[in-house]
């Protein structure tokens, strides 16, 4: 009989690579600031709100660059009014009326 070889070493290696990639993505995301607690001083609250504002600005910022180009091109093709740029002709040229 022929022994069937199981690909478990390959599956384990793929799982480890996937976990490493996911770990790198998690580290790239900014960490949410820790709340100071109920008995915090006004200076600590001020620092917390400043860091929270900075965190929210990072998370919700608009991203410019290559992602914007296809959408802008698509909207330009769909929503431009080309009738202003076309010359006005009441009759087709070269066609004799009878």
From Swiss-Prot:
Pfam family, one: Hormone_3
Matches recorded under CDD domains: PAH (cd00126)
Keywords on record: Amidation, Cleavage on pair of basic residues, Hormone, Phosphoprotein, Secreted, Signal
Modified residues (Tyrosine amide): 64
Residues found modified as Phosphoserine: 41
Recorded GO CC terms: extracellular space
Record PTM text: The peptide YY form is cleaved at Pro-30 by the prolyl endopeptidase FAP (seprase) activity (in vitro) to generate peptide YY(3-36).
Record has Membrane as a keyword: no
Role according to the record: This gut peptide inhibits exocrine pancreatic secretion, has a vasoconstrictory action and inhibitis jejunal and colonic mobility.
Protein name: Peptide YY
Annotated organism of origin: Rattus norvegicus
């Amino acid at each position: 009989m022929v022994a069937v070889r199981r690909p478990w070493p390959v599956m384990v290696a793929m799982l480890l690579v996937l976990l490493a990639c996911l770990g790198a993505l998690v580290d790239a995301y900014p960490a949410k600031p820790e709340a100071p607690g109920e008995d915090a001083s006004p200076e600590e609250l001020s620092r917390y709100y400043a860091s929270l504002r900075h965190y929210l600005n990072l998370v919700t910022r608009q991203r410019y660059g290559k992602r914007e180009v296809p959408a802008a091109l698509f909207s330009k093709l769909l929503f431009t009014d080309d009738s202003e740029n076309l010359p006005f002709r009441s009759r087709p040229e070269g066609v004799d009326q009878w």
